[in-house]
Amino acid sequence: MLYLCGGKILRVKRILDIIKDWMLPIAIVLGIVSYLILHFIPVLHENVEPWFSVFAKDVQPVFVATMLFLQFNKISPHDLKIKRWHFALLAFQLVSFAAMALLAAGLPEGDWKILAESAMLCFVCPTAAAAGVITDKLGGSLSDTVTYVVMINVAATIFIPLAIPVVKDTGDMTFIQYVLAISKRIFPLLVLPLLLAWAIRYGWRKLQRKLMRYTHWAFYFWGISLCLSIYLATRATVTSGISLWIGIAIAAISLAACMLQFWFGHHVAGSGSRSDSITAGQALGQKNSGFLIWVGYSFLTPVTSVAGGLYSIWQNLVNSLELFQAKKHKTA
């Protein structure tokens, strides 16, 4: 009897290990396929897709916030230290963003302006809050990732409101209104889990020690969040109504921006440790694609939101490759 129970436990463990190893590609495929099924089967498109899309949009940030809370339990405020490569990444994002914004501002309304706006968004978009999960698995520094997540989110909150009125006629919205709109989108997801984790760390150490046992659950919350994110990204792309050539052009621009930022991040910190190279690559390459989609749809030409959906797919394909290479290197 014990032998049978032990065999079942081993089988379950093997299944969980397989899911863990293949979580990222599983989430990508499941997110894409699930939306396409709901979109192209008429009865599901009418009765299921509308409410499930609203559900996915509402619940996805909850999974991200829970994941961040579990991760932040591992980090002390003293662990957040700014390094030189943090400033290099910040300068790269802001200079690239400014260059694309000036280009977009000088172009008339039309396809070329859409492409410039798409590139602009791909460069300024803040680091994904979930970047620490992959960074941690690859052997990078979670605390250094969180440091840059905070830095770029603060910078984006200031610089995006400065650039948008230059690129697009935005009516009566003021700088402060832009800042407040973006802050409401960013900070509840990032700041509240951080403050809660640190409040527990310094006010309820016994609970904090118990929560430390469950920090590995952050990976599974990330997997669910990623699946929903890919679902929403696929929906934004399919329902955009863009022409074929614009779709291909935005795909090419978002892919180029993705590869360039992963490459620059890895190389700008290459003179440091391997951990720094991994961390900088993830900090610059991984983007909060949901935020990118929202800014494009809300303040710029709406079809630029497609860049966010496509960037999400590219960055997760890069992450899949990096995780595969890391596992291969580990077993070699």
Model-derived features with residue positions:
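Alpha-helical transmembrane segments of multi-pass small-molecule/ion transporters
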Residues: 2-332
